[in-house]
Structures are given as structure tokens and as C-alpha cells.
Amino acid sequence: MGKNYYLAVDIGASSGRHMLSHMENGKMILEEIYRFPNGMVEKNGHKVWDVDKLFEEILTGMKKCALAGKIPYSMGIDTWAVDFVLLDENDRRIGDAVAYRDRRTEGMDRRVYGIISEEDLYLRTGIQKQIFNTIYQLMAVKEQQPGQLEQAKSMLMIPDYFHFLLTGKKVQEYTNATTTQLADPVTKDWDMELIRKLGYPKEIFQKIKKSGFEVGGLSGEIQKKVGFDCKVVLPPTHDTASAVAAVPTQDEHALYISSGTWSLMGTELKEADCSKSSMLHNMTNEGGYDYRFRYLKNIMGLWMIQSVKKESAPDLGFGEICALASKEAITSFVDVNDARFLAPQNMTEEVKKACEESGQQIPQTVGELAAVIYHSLAECYAKTVEEIEALTGITYPKIQIVGGGANAQYLNELTAKYTGKDVCAGPTEATAVGNLAAQMIAAGELRDLKAARACIAESFEMNMFRSDK
């Protein structure tokens, strides 16, 4: 059998990239083929994604594969969750692809809770309340632009929309469907009774398919543009679900942090925990690969340090900022999950203000600011570990950190110190790796998720950080 290449298109809020992979001597070999910028743009008074430009970038990266003579056997696209497009009867897009950080959802939680209480909604879906969830975004469309919903014949989440543009076929991938807060964790299908109650048109919701499902080949038009045909296979299209699929552990009960702009900290469950205590701890039950549940908590993550770097130290690398922070003696803490840090005018000033208001030492230098943020994050991780252990009744021996934050050495050291658990960091490219692993399982190159995780552990460098306890 010749060498099979697999293509993951992994698009995040600030950039996207095409990662090719093949198997060599039982290991996954990764190669970045193309990288492109992304970001929200202001249009018609809203923050939106330029999905037309993004699709052109997807095609550009595919052409690069052809130029390199590395034609993928299959490809799959993952992006952030919750955002969607509406299509009319001719499959034309209605309006813009509005972004989750847009303010149109303000007050929409109250509209939803007028129809179903917050507690009942959690019992039905098991999904943590985030004001940007699709359920609130659709309520914003219904309230503010009802004509769009009346005109709509299909709703596609962003990665499903790109898969549709490639193949002409509409499907809804499971992991991303769960983030809408409109899916039933027991049936693994849309909660049509909830959808009817909310007054959303039932016919716009596509059939839900598992990761690994083959959507189809490229349409004739796309084949002409890129110069080849290949299968389009559903990865876990929610980027965090792909990252968690790449957690390199064989433990049945493992604790992970998918560490990037957000830190998603949790474990995998076979069944969702939609209990009231889970709701009160703001835990979520998002869908994972093979119908596992990602029982996790959203934590602010590296967004704060990214913002401070941009404002106060654009010329320093994150490694240098880590090194500066490790030399500081400042002991001030902030609540990293405070809404004030979501999108402040100036993160540097906001952190200083929070320290001043709580009567603590005010950080002055970049090193001090970074130290406050890293210590505060590690302390938050420690509290979250305690919550998860109390809710699941399981004591976890170590923490697996995957994603870009696996490179934040000082933060990893602090995480081990504050949690009292050993930390295993890597792979940093977890999202692309999980996307690729799902394709390789579908192709029969890897037996199942357990085999894929064993292969990932062999293929990529991991760093261990020992706790003192």
C-alpha cells in the first residue's frame, strides 16, 4: 500500500492552517503546508467572520498540496464552536456569519428563560450557560431579524458549511451540534421538542453524523479549482473535541487541559452528568469523539497573557515572558474568570485595576503582570481540579496539557505546584492531530481511539512537570 496523506484544515479565531500527515514506522508525521490569518471584522454594525475569504484560503492550501505532489486521501475541517450560517431555498447564504463575541445576544438568555427555565434547559442538554451559545444567537435572529429565520431552509455550523461548499452535501457533525445547547445528550440527536418550544424552524436542522462519517468526494467545480479529488471525512469539527481526541493517555479516567486562548479543563465521561450540582459548578457536557462526553469547564486561558503581550510587549516571545515571570516575587492574584477580562479596552490596565481594588500589590512590569496572570491561572486550575474530583468521585493522578499552552513551561510548573499533580504537556498541535487521527481511524490506518492515542504518545514529544506532593 502506498503512503496515504491526510489533510486537517484547522481554523482558529486568529489563524488557520493546513496540516498534512502520513504514517511512517508506526508514527504520525506532521507537515504544515499553509497558514493564513483570520479575525473578526466589523460589518453592518456586527462582528462577523469573512467566511468567503476563509473558503478561498481553504482552497489555496489545498492547491499547495497538489503543487507539493501530496494529494490527500481524505480531508476534514475543524473550527471554533457555536457560530453558524443560514441558507435559503437556493442554498444561498442569508446575511453574515455573525461571530460569537458580537453583542447581539445580550439579554437573549432572559428571552430563552421566559420559555424554559435555566435549570430545565441544563437538565435537558447538560450544556454550560455561555451567552454566545447557538441557542441564544438564534433567539437574537428571531427577535432582531425575523425575516432571516422565515427565509431560512438550512442552518449549518461553520465547519459544516465549508464541508458543504466542498462537496455539495449538508450534514451536521455531532461534537459541534452539542455546543448549540439544542441537542439531547441521551438520544445524541436534536431536541426537537425544545426547538419547537423556542419557535425555531425544525426543518433548518440537518441530520447529525458522528466523527468519521464520509460526507463525500469534492464537487466537480472544486476538483477543477484544486486539481484533485479526495474524500471529505468528518473530524470532531469543534476544535476542542479534536484536541481532546489527541490527549495521549491510556487511562480510563484522565484529567486534561486543552490550553489555548481558552483553557478547557475536564475529563471524559461515558454518560452526561446533567445534575443540578453539575449546573451549579458551571460544568458542561460537550460531545466528544465516539459519543464520549467532554465534561469540562471553560476557563479564561492564555487570552489574558496574549492581550498583555500585544499591548505592553509586542517584541517579546511568550517564552521570554514566561522567563521574566518566573523571576518575580509578586504575590497578587486576580479572578481569571471575571467577566471584566473577557474583552477589556486594555488588559494591562484591567489587571492593575483589579489588584488595586482588592488591596494587593499592583504589577508594574511585564514580568510582574505575567506572574500575576500565570499564578492566578494555576490557582484556578487547582480549584477546578477539586471541583471535578468532588463531582466525579475520582482522584486523578496527573494532568495532561495539550494545545499551544503546552509550551508555556512556567505555567506548567505552576500548575503542578498548585494542583499537587504531575503534569504531562504535549502535543502542542493537538487540534490538528485529533482531526487527523479521526480520519486515519475512518481509513483503517488506526484501529480505534485507544490505538490512536497510543500512536500519538509515541509520535510527539511530551514534557513532564513533577509536583512537590
Region annotations inferred by a language model:
Residues 10, 97, 133, 154, ...:
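Small/polar loops that bind or transfer phosphate-bearing groups
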Residues 43, 63, 67-100, 125-132, ...:
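Short beta-strand-loop/turn "lid" adjacent to the catalytic site in phosphate-handling enzymes
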Residues 71-79, 154, 207, 391-403:
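Short glycine-rich phosphate-binding loop at a beta-alpha junction
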Residues 98, 102-115:
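Short alpha-helix plus adjacent loop in nuclease-associated cores
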